[in-house]
């Protein structure tokens, strides 16, 4: 950790709270951050710190390390807004919202009322066979080979297959979609990020306009029937929701899968627990969501407020640092241990009114991936000679993961 120069410190921020954290360096490191950087951070930082590099582009914001403090914020949409949180539109000089993620009440309530039934548990359960088949097709391509590039051959393709199926978008453009997604979510360069946002917007708007003219039974066509404030959704709202599905569906599960399968490859004996007691898979997924959560998201202070006695000014960013809060020793007993029978909750899929819209699908994807790998393959491990690297930043993941078995 490094102390930031005084020139970057607002007047209301005490010097002793200002830090620059390696956890948000947005680069590859050789040591697993869940075993090094995060426990060190929990042991040394106060409950609230002003981190100079916490937001993409090395922009500052407040880091909360406490689970309870973060949950209190998530339950308080009056004081902590999400309006424009990701700066996606602002990055390209526009003002649309990512829907429902960047909307606030009361319109957020109306958006979720229209969307929640479409992502309800029973709706997602109806996709189970389709999701399982997607997993099996990918696994069958490498299971007899004895090794795989897990990220390239499975974790990038599997959740994207499912989102593209849902939106009825062409599977043969997956590589291009992935390139755009990485340029948006894994760069520190705002020009690169903005160029990718423009490409995604241009593509999605073309699809939306075509579906508006020639509707089918796909999800995008159905969005036009959604109502808000007594009217149908407009094209900008339909786009804002499709953009939400694009950035959410193309990355979060991919990053989680890489983190999970890296852990199981480094500690193969933990696979044996799940093979011997497959009933643990459901709770194991929840524990992985706690221990290997990838995303640091944010809220924006809507007004002057205090957290732990520290003044927060309107417009300042406050973290929802799920990788960090999952290791809060004041909330979790022995947080450094991955325990498949742990029952404690987590906030890796959000909380409050902004609980993840796709959480039931995400859980199902993770559970099925584990079930199918454990069924199809013998015990896997990190491939001989392969050195795992970990990307630290706002979406923590393993960029490559070579596994072998047999």
Predicted feature residues:
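Cytochrome P450
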Residues: 1-406
């Amino acid at each position: 950790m490094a102390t930031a120069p005084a020139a970057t410190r607002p007047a209301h921020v005490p010097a002793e709270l200002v830090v620059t954290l390696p956890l948000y360096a947005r680069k590859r490191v050789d040591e697993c951050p869940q075993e090094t950087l995060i426990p060190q951070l929990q042991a040394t930082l106060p409950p609230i710190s002003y981190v100079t590099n916490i937001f993409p582009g090395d922009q500052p914001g407040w880091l909360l390390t406490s689970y309870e403090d973060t949950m209190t914020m998530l339950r308080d949409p009056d004081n902590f807004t999400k309006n424009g949180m990701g700066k996606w539109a602002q990055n390209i000089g526009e003002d649309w919202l990512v829907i429902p993620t960047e909307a606030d009440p009361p319109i957020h309530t109306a958006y979720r009322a229209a969307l929640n039934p479409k992502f309800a548990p029973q709706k997602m359960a109806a996709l189970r066979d389709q999701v399982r088949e997607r997993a099996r097709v990918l696994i069958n391509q490498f299971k007899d080979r004895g090794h795989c590039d897990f990220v390239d051959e499975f974790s990038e393709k599997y959740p994207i297959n499912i989102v593209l199926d849902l939106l009825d978008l062409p599977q043969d453009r997956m590589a291009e979609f992935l390139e755009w997604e990485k340029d948006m979510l894994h760069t520190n360069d705002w020009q690169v990020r903005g160029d990718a946002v423009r490409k995604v917007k241009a593509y999605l708007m073309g699809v939306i306009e075509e579906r508006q003219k020639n509707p089918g039974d796909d999800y995008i066509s159905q969005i036009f029937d959604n109502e808000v404030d007594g009217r149908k959704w407009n094209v900008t709202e339909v786009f804002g929701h499709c953009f939400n599905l694009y950035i959410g569906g193309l990355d979060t599960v991919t990053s989680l899968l890489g983190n999970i399968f890296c852990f199981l490859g480094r500690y193969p004996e933990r696979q044996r627990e799940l093979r011997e007691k497959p009933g643990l898979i459901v709770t194991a997924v929840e524990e992985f969501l706690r221990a290997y959560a990838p995303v640091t998201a944010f809220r924006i202070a809507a007004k002057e407020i205090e957290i732990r006695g520290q003044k927060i000014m309107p417009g300042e960013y406050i973290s929802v640092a799920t990788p960090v809060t999952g290791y809060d020793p004041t909330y979790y007993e022995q947080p450094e241990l991955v325990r498949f029978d742990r029952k404690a909750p987590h906030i890796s899929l959000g909380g409050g009114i902004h609980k993840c819209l796709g959480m039931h699908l995400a859980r199902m994807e993770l559970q099925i991936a584990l079930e199918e790998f454990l069924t199809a393959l013998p015990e896997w491990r990190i491939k001989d000679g392969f050195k795992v690297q970990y990307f630290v930043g706002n979406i923590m993941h393993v960029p490559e993961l070579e596994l072998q078995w047999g």
